[in-house]
Amino acid sequence: MVEVLRVANCSGFYGDRLDAAKEMIDGGPVDVLTGDYLAELTTTILYNQRQSRNTGYVGTFLKQVKAVAEHCVANNIKIVSNAGGLNPKGMAEEVEKIYEELGITAKVAYIDGDDIVPDLKDLQAGGETFTNIDTGEDLAAADVVTANTYFGAWGIKEALDNGADIVICPRVTDAAVVIGPAAWKFNWARDDYDALAGALAAGHIIECGAQCCGGNYAFFEEVPSYRDVGYPIAEIEADGSFTVTKHPGTGGLVSVGTISAQLLYEISTPAYYNPDVVAHFDTLKIEQVGDDRVRVSGTRGSNPPPTHKVCVNTRGPYKQSTEVLLTGLDIEKKAEIYLDAILHNIGGREQFDDVDVQLIRSDHEDPDTNEVSHAALRITFVASDPSKLGRLLQAKMTELGLANIPGNTGRGGGGYSGNQVLVHWPCFIDSKKVV
């Protein structure tokens, strides 16, 4: 019988189903429980939490750990997660408290060092420009609040090699929480590229949780039930081949279609880059091998790129939005009149960095109900100076309620204060400078 490592995923984002962790360990045999919580947006959420509550990690993960800790330790199920976010040490300390409260002896490990904010000036002086992948801008003029390198799998493998029962990760690649345990189980070397590429494919497929089990699937009518959609398990073999399945009795579907859809998720070219290996997705084979069982084999890998990706977040301008509902005839003309009046009331468009105007035509001709009778005029004001926004701006818009076009009604928006935006800044760093 082929030896496999059963890696289960219980989370695809911060806010995913809380009881999925317990469901995965109670529903059948698994060897490793993983969870991915760190979308790029999540980093900004954790930054704000760290500023206000001194946390910076995914607090709901602690509830999941408490629910599964005894079972996992008793059955030697490892836990690997990136829920450490911006504070993996703090998360590890909280996990240790949970084990102590439960009277459990377990080894808790955490990975650190992804935060390069303290080193940014030295790195830039050494030639790192951190050029924005999307815009080509240089980071030098930006106001940086977070900067985290996407680590690979080898720190996770080392922690497991040293007997860790749970590994708390910071900003690692989504697939690293799967590659690391597989490399540990089968003792892969850094140049076992085909095996690593297979594990990368497995990690990429199960990283989004229930999404590869029928969630967000375009051909949704193929899915037997969307009640209690199951979460995925990757049964990984020594050569990197794997079979994706889910626990019996759960909803959803594991098919060639659902796995192919997830494989193509966030992919630009068939060469999928990771700090540990490049997986060539045009080499692999996908086949249905049973009910809710799909095997992926033959993935070829090559040496990793010379750079690591970095997730930077910078302080952007301030924004404030409002919406007004327009009804009746001549919607475009009404929108034009309303916009002219509001810009006049507040002293002109030129004082803002930008004014974004969208006319959303959700209205129907000769509507049967009020809900389909209106269009929405959405106005977003952008300013580097926060004094340009706030209560006065909102008041000037409110004043038009009885003094402008017929059939208009406000629908709120950004409230009475313009909020500062945190802007995602994707870039690279020379891998030789990653510690």
Descriptions of predicted regions:
Residues M1-E23:
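N-terminal amphipathic/basic leader segments beginning at the initiator methionine
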Residues V2-E3, L38-N54, V73, I116-A142:
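Gly-rich Lys/Arg/Thr-decorated short loops/hinges at beta-loop-alpha junctions or inter-strand turns
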Residues F13-Y14, A39-L41, A83-M91, R171-V177, ...:
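Gly/Ser/Thr-rich loops at beta-strand to alpha-helix junctions
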Residues E100-I116, I179-F220, P224:
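Catalytic or ion-translocation cores adjacent to nucleophile or general acid/base/metal-coordination motifs
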